[in-house]
Amino acid sequence: YGKSKLMAEQFLDSIGNEFNYIVLRPTGVYGPREKDYFLMAKSIKQHVDFSVGFQRQDITFVYVQDVVQAVFLALDHGMSGRKYFLSDGNVYQSSTFSDYLHEELGKPWWIRVKAPIWVLRLVTFFGEHIGRMRHTITALNNDKFNILKQRNWRCDIEPACDELGYHPHYDLRKGVTESVAWYKENHWL
């Protein structure tokens, strides 16, 4: 969970009932215009699938249109102070996303590179410092390291389903198919 998001939640909790709020905690958000997961598609199109860690990683995803659905449902049905995880309701191994991208891109030849976590730590350390020098936020920073090193991103979306009426319409395969189609139509790939 990003540091700034956690701090925002802690602030809201500290002011109690003075302010009405609902917290949505979307897991790996992907889809049209999203850039972090797009970089994976671009890398695979360039024949490299890069991942880190040698232990199994369970991860969850949510397509951007399902996040939009949840926002409107929260506005209509949510109770102030409640917090809801959002995903498509499934748990995937980390390689599943790149496998689906590979299929949608027409199965170009590729090299799968798997590096130890400490390599990611070095990359994110330097990425963070380069970003500070350039006054920009880089995709690979210390926050991203804390996210990517985790091996279990399972979450329970039942409260969102029960209380908001949230029902995701996109599983990962369908969402990746639409994302890659959008990337191609809009000349991102």
What does each model-identified segment do?
Residues 74-139, 173, 177-180:
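Mid/C-terminal beta-alpha module of Rossmann-like enzyme folds, strongest
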Residues 19-39:
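Flexible, glycine-rich beta-alpha linker
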Residues 1-22:
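Active-site Tyr-X1-5-Lys
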Residues 41-52, 107, 133-139, 158:
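A short C-terminal helix-loop "cap" of Rossmann-like NAD(P)-dependent dehydrogenase/epimerase domains
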Residues 64, 99, 124-166:
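Conserved C-terminal active-site "lid" loop/helix of NAD(P)H-dependent oxidoreductases
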Residues 3, 7-8, 34-39, 53-75, ...:
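Substrate-positioning beta->alpha
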Residues 155-163, 167, 171-189:
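Amphipathic terminal alpha-helices
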Residues 59-65, 92, 155, 170:
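Residue-level signal for the nucleotide or nucleotide-sugar donor/cofactor binding architecture
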